[in-house]
Amino acid sequence: MFLGVAGKKFAVEVDEKEVAIREALPGNNCGGCGYPGCDGLAAAIAKGEAPVNRCPVGGEPVGKIIAGIMGQEAVETARQVAHVKCSGTCEKAKEEYIYTGVEDCEMLPFVPNGGAKACTYGCCGFGSCVKVCPFGAIHIVDGIAVVDKEACKACGKCVAKCPRHLIELIPYSQKVAVDCSSHDKGKQVTAACEVGCIGCKKCEKTCPNGAVTVENFCAHIDYEKCTGCGACKEACPRGVIREV
């Protein structure tokens, strides 16, 4: 009898909503939501501490299920995808020496010139982002990281891992993006890479929506203003603004 009473006294109450939410989540435990795995997110949503559409992997379908569990209206979620802001392939980017050391992006501060490539802003191709991606959505192709748009779940792990901040999350529906992150002046850029942005501002002047600006010699697109007309892509003399 004592054990029965003690069992009731110390029993852990189970939040049925939390259990249902956890079952609805994909279970990747990628941490892209900002919580320690799916269990942490389920608990936060059940307590009202996180929005029902917080899971980037589950996206809108999972968000709708969780909204139903919480008795809320479903919130429309725009899908995102990771994008690498670099075009410096082995063919296009100048290499100053042959690197034979450890291939780890976190070692860049200790590597001469920050890597073999003349451009110190671009992708070194060591692939730390590849190793951290839980969905196999990133691959090193011709010396730079390339994202498989369909496989990417926008968990953001690659964004956090890249020491040069070359990877960003952009709308899945986005039609064009700037594939460069260099802030060097034009002469330095042309000496280091065949396709780097030289900050000429032709894209900025051509955009009919004011979505493109050039800051510190590099073009940037405001995705909220961009309509995907492609005018900037056509105007770019370096071919650094590309379809995504």
For every predicted segment, state its role.
Residues 1-206, 210, 233-235, 239-243:
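Ferredoxin-type iron-sulfur electron-transfer modules and their immediate structural context
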Residues 219:
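Glycan-recognition and catalytic cores of secretory/periplasmic carbohydrate-active enzymes
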